[in-house]
């Protein structure tokens, strides 16, 4: 067994000695894991990340709203393919849309997914940049303080799914294509995933 070996880890130009869990191939082969629940059947399971990508205007936000209403209201995205039976709490964070547009998308998504409206109203929470007071700033998920605040909120509210719409408006970084610039956000995503 090689668990709990000390290694020097370099992170953001700082080195520190930390305990690292190391498994042999045999130990991994004998590990048992509980079944992960489907958030949306045959599409998305708990402890998984999903990123939706397409050119502008192809319906990414509509799809995100469909996922949110299906999970919170027991809806169906595609009959017989992507369905949800167990209701979960969802937090949708929107970085750019007008509140009136968000309201319209919510109502149309509830109808399109045949979700239970009262369940969606109870289980879906929305944080919108456009709903905030001017000049007070907004979440920057590239920033550790914003990340910590969001994680605390999610844990305190019992939220199972966080939907970020969209990356460019919620993560302030100099270069989205730079691996080093992405590292704080990647750390945040892994931190969220490990909290399950």
Regions from the language model: what does each represent?
Residues 1-10:
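N-terminal acidic, proline/glycine-rich, low-complexity intrinsically disordered segments
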Residues 9-111, 116, 155:
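The Walker A/P-loop phosphate-binding site
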Residues 17, 56, 84-175:
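Conserved inter-motif catalytic segment of the P-loop NTP-binding fold
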Residues 30, 140, 178-179:
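A generic secondary-structure micro-motif detector
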Residues 33, 143-144, 181-182:
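A conditional alpha-helix N-cap/helix-loop micro-motif detector
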Residues 36-37, 146-147, 185:
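Amphipathic coiled-coil/heptad-repeat helices and related helical stalk/stem segments
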Residues 150-155, 182-196:
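Substrate-engagement module of ASCE P-loop NTPases
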């Amino acid at each position: 067994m090689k668990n709990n070996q000390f290694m020097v880890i370099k992170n953001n130009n700082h080195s520190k000695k930390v305990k690292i869990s190391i498994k042999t191939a045999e130990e991994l082969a004998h590990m048992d894991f509980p079944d992960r629940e489907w958030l949306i059947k045959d599409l998305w399971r708990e402890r998984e990340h999903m990123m939706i990508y397409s050119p502008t205007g192809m319906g990414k936000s509509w799809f995100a709203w469909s996922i949110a209403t299906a999970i919170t209201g027991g809806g169906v995205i595609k009959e017989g393919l992507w369905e949800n039976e167990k209701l979960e709490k969802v937090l949708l964070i929107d970085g750019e849309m007008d509140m009136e547009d968000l309201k319209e998308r919510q109502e149309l998504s509830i109808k399109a997914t045949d979700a239970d409206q009262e369940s969606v109203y109870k289980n879906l929470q929305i944080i919108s940049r456009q709903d905030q007071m001017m000049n007070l700033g907004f979440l920057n998920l590239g920033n550790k303080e914003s990340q910590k605040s969001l994680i605390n909120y999610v844990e305190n509210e019992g939220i199972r799914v966080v939907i970020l719409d969209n990356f460019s408006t919620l993560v302030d970084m100099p270069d989205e294509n730079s691996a080093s610039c992405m590292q704080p956000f990647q750390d945040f995503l892994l931190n969220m995933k490990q909290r399950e």
